[in-house]
Regions:
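Short, well-ordered surface patches within globular domains
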Residues: 2-65, 126
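A well-ordered secondary-structure block
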Residues: 56-157
Length: 157
């Protein structure tokens, strides 16, 4: 959608501060839609964060999907939230206190593999993809954002 492309552009600017080669492409809402579907409990309330993240991880990595990619999520109420604030909220989910892309903040960070390499031997690549879907919690409008990035083996420093 146009709104997800605009948010992707804003986010790209923010991520470039952490990784000057970063690009962010808006993709369809499929991943975010799947994430939003498992975000609420049976009563329709938003799950507590740890449960929500675990359930989204289970949903998005079914059948070993995205095993070579980091998955970050952000979700928040959208009342009075413009594209810049949306992008800032998403950037917070990806960037660590050191100002770099933080793969430990990815919901599946401990499971990502590149060939037989994992953990500290791998890092996020440069191509980020953003999936965004609006959903409701009671009467409140929320957005679910899923950002994925293929992992790569760290270059020897």
């Amino acid at each position: 959608s146009i709104s997800s492309r605009r948010v992707a552009d804003e986010l790209e600017g923010m991520l470039k501060a952490a990784n000057d080669k970063a690009t962010v492409k808006a993709i369809d809402d499929d991943l975010a839609n799947k994430a939003a579907k498992v975000a609420k409990d049976n009563s329709g309330a938003l799950k507590v964060e740890t449960t929500l993240k675990a359930d989204v991880k289970t949903e998005l990595t079914k059948n070993n999907k995205l095993g070579d990619s980091y998955i970050w999520i952000a979700y928040f109420a959208t009342k009075d939230v413009n594209k810049t604030v949306k992008a800032q909220n998403i950037a917070k989910a990806l960037i660590g206190t050191n100002g770099k892309i933080d793969t430990t903040k990815a919901i599946n960070s401990s499971d990502v593999k590149v060939g037989d390499k994992n953990g500290a031997a791998i890092e996020a690549g440069n191509k980020f993809e953003l999936s965004m879907k609006d959903f409701k919690v009671g009467d409140t409008d929320y957005v679910m954002v899923v950002v994925t990035c293929k992992a790569q083996v760290k270059a020897a420093s």
